[in-house]
């Protein structure tokens, strides 16, 4: 394994950490409706738990309302129950075979709590990125010990991985700032 291989591997893993962080951010409810909010809601579909997107069409009715239309009329109650039990604090209302999910406005206190949650998630993502940097640096030390690369190559590799770490940490900070702005916008 060379410095370039290690760097490429670390970059891919760091990118996966960012993607996981983005997925976690999407679950944080803001005042506006978005279909991604219901992505992790699981529905009991004839005895097996499946994502809501597999049993219903999820769309936006307006800026504060999500519309959910189950493909089978029999599934309306199960989908409504899954949304209600989905720990998002949402209260769906059924109108015929369409479920409307209004987004309640967030209180100032709840907004502040959500920004703390986002910062906590960000710190977890940063720790994951830094752990990947540490693993890469240990890999470089091992390569030097095995005489596969020179100490100069090790230093260059560590510098490149540090630049990657800085880049991904900055991206996390940018995502946090955007999410906080979205949460605090009334």
Curated annotation (Swiss-Prot):
Keywords: Cytoplasm, Protein biosynthesis. One of its GO terms (biological process) is cytoplasmic translational termination. The keyword Cell cycle does not apply. GO terms for cellular component: cytosol. Gene3D superfamilies: 3.30.1360.40, Ribosome-recycling factor (1.10.132.20). The keyword Iron-sulfur does not apply. One of its GO terms (molecular function) is ribosomal large subunit binding. SUPFAM superfamilies: Ribosome recycling factor, RRF (SSF55194). Belongs to the RRF family. This is Ribosome-recycling factor. It comes from Cupriavidus metallidurans (strain ATCC 43123 / DSM 2839 / NBRC 102507 / CH34). The gene is frr.
């Amino acid at each position: 394994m060379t410095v370039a291989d290690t760097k490429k591997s670390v970059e891919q893993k760091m990118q996966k950490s960012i993607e996981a962080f983005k997925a976690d951010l999407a679950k944080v409810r803001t005042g506006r409706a978005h279909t991604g909010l219901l992505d992790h809601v699981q529905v009991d579909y004839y005895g097996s738990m499946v994502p809501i997107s597999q049993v219903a069409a999820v769309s936006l009715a307006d800026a504060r309302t999500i519309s959910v239309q189950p493909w089978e009329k029999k599934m309306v109650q199960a989908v409504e129950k899954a949304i209600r039990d989905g720990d998002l604090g949402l209260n769906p209302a059924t109108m015929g075979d369409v479920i409307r999910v209004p987004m309640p406005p967030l209180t100032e206190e709840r907004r502040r709590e959500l920004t703390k949650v986002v910062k906590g998630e960000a710190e977890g993502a940063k720790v994951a990125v830094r752990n990947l940097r540490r693993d890469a640096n240990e890999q470089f030390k091992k390569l030097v010990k095995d005489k596969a690369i020179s100490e100069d190559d090790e230093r260059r590799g560590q510098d490149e991985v540090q630049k990657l770490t800085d880049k991904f940490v900055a991206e996390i900070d940018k995502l946090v700032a955007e999410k906080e702005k979205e949460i605090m916008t009334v």
